[in-house]
């Protein structure tokens, strides 16, 4: 079983602004969000299939607790409440489908994958995919 536990810092990010656009975030808020999310700090605790993930930026801190295969509540990248279900896509990759609790919007998901001692995080909104690569601190 892969070990996601540890603290992670972002090395690169692609398409974050495009992702926010696809989610309908206005230009002013996108500018603030892109600046704030340029140096996120991620802490992951893992006990088998049980995960705790805390992501901190200068503007916002999010925390999620979940177990693979059990639905849980969290927020989409743009802050809307959703019901999520994380599953193992393969032995090193978690896929999490998000379903909005209220309202309409693009189909969203995230993945987290360990590869070559890097954490590869993707956020998807319909056809737009943001990829962020993290390294251990």
Swiss-Prot record:
Origin species, per record, is: Gallus gallus (Chicken)
Q: What does this protein do?
A: Cytosolic CRABPs may regulate the access of retinoic acid to the nuclear retinoic acid receptors.
Q: What is its main location?
A: cytoplasm
User: Which Pfam families does the record cross-reference, listed alphabetically?
Assistant: Lipocalin
**Keywords of this protein's UniProt record, alphabetized?**
Cytoplasm, Retinol-binding, Transport, Vitamin A
GO CC field: axon; cell body fiber; cytosol; neuron projection; nucleus
Q: Where in the cell is it found?
A: Cytoplasm
Q: What is this protein called?
A: Cellular retinoic acid-binding protein 1
What is the gene name? CRABP1
Biological process per Gene Ontology, one example term: fatty acid transport
Motif location (Nuclear localization signal)?
21-31
